[in-house]
UniProtKB/Swiss-Prot annotation:
Residues 528-605 form the AGC-kinase C-terminal domain. This is Serine/threonine-protein kinase sck2. It comes from the Eukaryota. The keyword DNA repair does not apply. The keyword Lipid metabolism does not apply. Residues 17-85, 143-176, 609-646 are annotated as: Disordered. Protein kinase that is part of growth control pathway which is at least partially redundant with the cAMP pathway. The active site is at 392 (proton acceptor). It comes from Schizosaccharomyces pombe (strain 972 / ATCC 24843). ATP binds at residues 272-280, 295. Its EC number is 2.7.11.1. One of its GO terms (molecular function) is protein serine/threonine kinase activity. GO terms for cellular component: cytosol; nuclear envelope. Residues 68-80 have a biased composition (Polar residues).
Length: 646
């Protein structure tokens, strides 16, 4: 079966599956290779699934249950203090990873023996939601060690040229002992839109990627300032024999070298997905060499399928979620367009899709499922606070980063601007995860549909199959509206079963979360022992770490795509590509699509490119104006775009 990770990145496979069609994916079957479901949307005629033979809705249906055990999730600590800056930073931060220094009261011979056992260490650098995986650490020749000087604020002249014009000096090396120290000559450049600390995690590849230790650095965001750090590493209990472990790093921050981006600013590395509207590539940004995921969509296909409103709406929601700054939502970094195509550039999550890992494991231990559900709650919290209902929660839309934290993606079925007390009626979602109120369409629905899907997801992760499994879609709908949910004997804890029961309450007014949204769900005993502040700061170690060999590792993607030769110009390929160009009226439907993840870039640097609307940057002020203009254009061009979700 095709790996849905590759097809579902950005939701390429989800669009407009008619609800009254005989075709479509069957729901997941119990204890078998998990089948993936296509989301469904309202058809052109607004047709809903045939449920007239289902009878009245079943409210608060009792669920059968059995017992199991429960345990807790571990955590780690850190201190976050950022230096003050005299401006809103927008530019490039270059980080050079120096060497590890292992000190302490041991003899040189003992330390040398200790180091020889740790010859496959590597570093995962977390910069906001962007991550970098270093090459394996190399051992420096014996008798050499770096100095342990602390932060050095040596000035580097300010310049708007490329990063190479101000290379980071090599750390001073001096002979201090006969201890070999690991050395990595790697460096990374991050695109900066806001001041954040740098989270550095060290892992031992030679010991099944065991976590070794963690440290933070808090770089200055003053332009041209070079800094040198030699930070103490907080080691894990398994490596507490490593006394006084330190990591040397250097940073320098520089202003932007350009203020607009297009396809020519990125180099394609691999094709990682393909769908109805276009392709998804693993790309490298030329100026910073950062790796991202780029979705390329054909405008003509979008217009032909009347999906302009949904496509631009997805971009709008990605802008809002990027502003939310949630570490558990895939961040939009750039969006731009050409006369033919739309481009969405987000962080690349090399850990793979949760669906892919669930398919391999069949089910997860309860503690692992608890960790994912807890982080998903924080993602939903960020969405709901901004009036966004997600509507398509499922394993295919949950990505893992290199360290094993989740990141929610694909907002094509989400709806924004849903205030408290209001409802919507569009029939959309994925069959296995549809809430009863969506199927019955009696009085519309609200954000409670996300909690129903969360309950289905928790059941599926812990039991290995869908709670409402059926051989056909109509029977699946009946099971969702009426069916009993049965729990395998002895598999789940009392708390897990109770949480699933409360989330799968068929009356949305009595569903857990109805009276306090995410915060109400977080208080359930299932989550006792979780420090939510540490979880939000990613200070709790994930129970599972994906195998990732480097920042461009695509081993978690379908080889059907990654083994294909790629077109270097990113242009979408479809049967309409050689037809007449789109009219200016239709092109106006895509107005305001361009975005760069730096709300203050226009104001900070005075960049306004009025001659090139396809490459202009949308600041927060401009974004609001663009949104207003775009709404008018959408209303004028509904013949091309289809109806906007009410």
């Amino acid at each position: 079966m095709m790996n849905k990770w590759a097809k579902n990145w950005f939701g390429l496979s989800k669009k407009s599956v008619s609800t009254n069609s005989a075709k479509g994916s069957l729901p997941r079957s119990p204890l078998a290779s998990i089948q993936t479901n296509q989301p469904v949307e309202e058809g052109e005629g607004g047709s809903l699934p045939s449920v007239s033979n289902l009878g009245p809705s079943s409210i608060d249906h009792p669920m059968e249950e059995f017992a199991s055990d429960q345990s807790t999730v571990g955590n780690r600590n850190s201190n976050d203090i950022l230096p003050e800056v005299d401006h809103e930073p927008s530019g490039y931060l270059k980080l050079q990873i120096g060497s590890l220094v292992l000190g302490g009261p041991h003899t040189d011979a003992a330390l040398a023996m200790e180091c020889s056992r740790l010859n496959q260490l590597f570093v995962v650098v977390q910069f906001g939601t962007t991550e970098f995986v270093s090459p394996p650490l190399k051992w420096e020749s014996p008798g050499r060690d770096i100095g342990t000087s602390s932060r050095d604020s040596a000035n580097v002249s300010r310049s708007s040229s490329m990063m190479s014009s101000h290379p980071i000096p090599t750390p001073a090396i001096q002979r201090t002992s006969s201890i070999p120290n690991p050395l990595t000559p790697s460096y990374v450049v991050f695109d900066v839109a806001k001041p954040v600390p740098i989270d550095v995690n060290i892992y031992d590849h030679g010991n099944n990627n065991e976590f070794v230790g963690r440290t933070y650095i808090h770089p200055s965001y003053n332009y041209g300032q070079f800094e040198q750090f030699c930070n103490s590493v907080e080691v894990s209990p398994a490596y507490n024999r490593m006394v006084d472990l330190r990591l040397s790093l250097n940073t320098v921050f520089q202003p932007l070298s350009q203020h607009s981006y297009g396809p020519d600013d990125f180099v394609p590395l691999k094709l990682i997905g393909k769908g109805t509207f276009g392709q998804v590539y693993l790309v490298r940004k030329k100026d910073t060499e950062r790796v991202y995921a780029m979705k390329v969509l054909s405008k003509k296909v979008i217009v032909r399928r009347k999906e302009v409103a949904h496509t631009v709406g997805e971009r709008d929601i990605l802008v809002q979620t990027s502003a939310a700054d949630s570490p558990f939502i895939v961040a939009l970094r750039f969006s731009f367009q050409t006369p033919k195509d739309l481009y969405l550039v987000t962080d690349y999550m090399a850990g793979g899709e949760l669906f892919w890992h669930l398919q391999k494991s069949v089910r997860f231990p309860e503690e692992r499922a608890k960790f994912y559900i807890a982080e998903l709650l924080l993602a939903l919290q960020a969405l709901h606070k901004r009036g966004i209902v997600y509507r398509d929660l499922k394993p295919e839309n949950i990505l893992l980063d290199v360290q094993g934290h989740i990141a929610l993606c694909d907002f094509g079925l989400s709806k924004a601007n849903l205030s408290v007390g209001t409802t919507t009626r569009t029939f959309c979602g994925t069959t296995d995860y549809l809430a009863p109120e969506v199927i019955l369409d009696e009085a519309g629905y609200d954000m409670m549909v996300d909690f129903w899907s969360l309950g289905v997801l928790l059941y599926e992760m812990t039991c290995g199959w869908s709670p409402f499994y059926a051989d056909n879609t109509q029977q699946l709908y009946k099971n969702i509206v009426f069916g009993k949910v049965r729990f395998p004997r002895g598999l789940l804890s009392v708390e897990a079963r109770d949480l699933i029961k409360l989330l799968l309450n068929r009356n949305p007014k009595h569903r857990l979360g109805a009276h306090g949204d995410v915060e109400e769900v977080m208080k359930h005993p299932f989550f006792d022992g979780i420090d939510w502040k540490k979880l939000a700061a990613k200070e709790i170690s994930p129970p599972f770490k994906p195998i990732v060999e480097g920042e461009i590792d695509v081993s978690n993607f379908d080889v059907e795509f990654t083994n294909k030769a790629i077109d270097r110009d990113f242009s979408s390929t479809d049967e309409m590509s050689t037809s007449a160009p789109l009219s200016s009226t239709v092109q106006n439907g895509f107005k305001g699509f361009t975005y760069i993840d730096a709300s203050a870039m226009d104001e900070a640097f005075g960049y306004h490119n009025s001659n090139d609307s396809a490459s202009s940057i949308s600041s927060q002020d401009d974004y609001s104006k663009d949104n207003s203009d775009m709404d008018l254009n959408r209303a004028n061009d509904e013949v091309f775009m289809g109806q906007i979700d009410p």
